[in-house]
Amino acid sequence: MKRVLVLLLALAFGHALERGRDYEKDKVCNELAMLGKEDFRSLSLILYSRKFSSSTFEQVNQLVKEVVSLTEECCAEGADPTCYDTRTSELSVKSCESDAPFPVHPGTPECCTKEGLERKLCMAALSHQPQEFPTYVEPTNDEICEAFRRDPKGFADQFLYEYSSNYGQAPLPLLVAYTKNYLSMVGSCCTSANPTVCFVKERLQMKHLSLLTTMSNRVCSQYAAYGKEKSRLSHLIKLAQKVPTANLENVLPLAEDFTEILSRCCESTSEDCMASELPEHTIKICQNLSKKNSKFEECCQENTPMNIFMCTYFMPAAEPLQLPAIKLPTGKDLCGQSTTQAMDQYTFELSRRTQVPEVFLSKVLEPTLKTLRECCDTQDSVACFSTQSPLLKRQLTSFIEKGQEMCADYSENTFTEYKKKLAERLRTKTPNTSPAELKDMVEKHSDFASKCCSINSPPLYCSSQIDAEMIDTLQS
């Protein structure tokens, strides 16, 4: 698997280019020889589908064709020594044409102002934001087999593109393993005497790998969006909201452990990284929290580590504790050696008192604490804290109240009941609104809530939506 990943990274015209053209060419040619054309092509399709997840199948497929063609030509015995450099340069030039058939990216025009190796490296760094709302829907068994029998290769290509573009944040080895097993299942079952029985049996055997791949995509998407430190605080917020009766000492090690797992596994070349790390993490979850919360205790009775992890991951926030209001960290807290500890303590204490979803808290806490920390570097830090703390406290309170209003009634009701209550609230708030306008308002608000008012809401999408909804609060 590691050898496969070397190939895929080289195909992206990335790190190998910095080591020299001969090094890059030798790597790619060795991998083509080892894998053969079809596996080389399939793996290229997976890579570019996940890299350019917003592109069409035709755009990705065209790029793959170009890459495979130039690799075949330039790795052939007796090929011109300059072939690889010439063809990759031609590809980067073609990518800059207005009618280029390749994936479109807003950063392409800037790359096209550069020349030679600099342009190739710039192009290699381009990628689309991950798909935070996967749209892939598996066809029925009959539809699968009909498409497979009609065009086995076309079916495989379309599946690799759709699955990889939807779940592209899953670690690459997992993505490769799952798609390979899935296509093997289709090939076996669509040619068997009893496809239905075959599919049931095969899917049961693949269940763990399927869950591991989709769950890894979820958690790695957030990690990619937030980065390591913000991911750590995000997991701390979620755990504090799920188990507000726990202590910081119970939840902080779990947040840090999970963040370390993601930092190791999301870009790992090992297929076993997530498979071995997550079970160990679930043991720690159960050791730390099963006695602190009845829902965690129930989750820890599940029969597999993956089921335990999923149970705890999707667990909603508990009712926040009714505790005295918490004060913002002071200069003494933030300007000494225990800055991180003070911020963790404040994040934990605020989260266990607050029902607003994590995406809201993560968004408002970062600038709030950053502004306070900056007071430490001013000439008169005491005066800075005295001025900034009351202002930041008002902004923080206003932001949280607005977030609670936007997500009111969502988590404790069915979606239908929520929409009824939402309509009543909006009707009371805007009594002169026409029925058609009210309907539009309900649809807009409920769409936002369905995407951004749960504990695992996607950060990139929701951050921009919160900006749009709360612009006055954010600027005040």
Curated annotation (Swiss-Prot):
Where, subcellularly, is it found? Secreted
**What are the Albumin domain coordinates in residue numbering?**
17-208, 209-394, 395-476
Q: Chief subcellular site?
A: secreted
Q: Where is the signal peptide?
A: 1-16
| Glycosylation site list | 288
Reading the lineage from the top rank, the first entry is: Eukaryota
The UniProt subunit note reads as follows: Associates with membrane-bound immunoglobulin on the surface of B-lymphocytes and with IgG Fc receptor on the membranes of T-lymphocytes. Interacts with LRP2; the interaction is required for renal uptake of GC in complex with 25-hydroxyvitamin D3.
Instruction: Write the protein's name.
Output: Vitamin D-binding protein
Q: Per the UniProt entry, what species is this protein from, by scientific name? A: Mus musculus (Mouse)
Taxonomic lineage = Eukaryota, Metazoa, Chordata, Craniata, Vertebrata
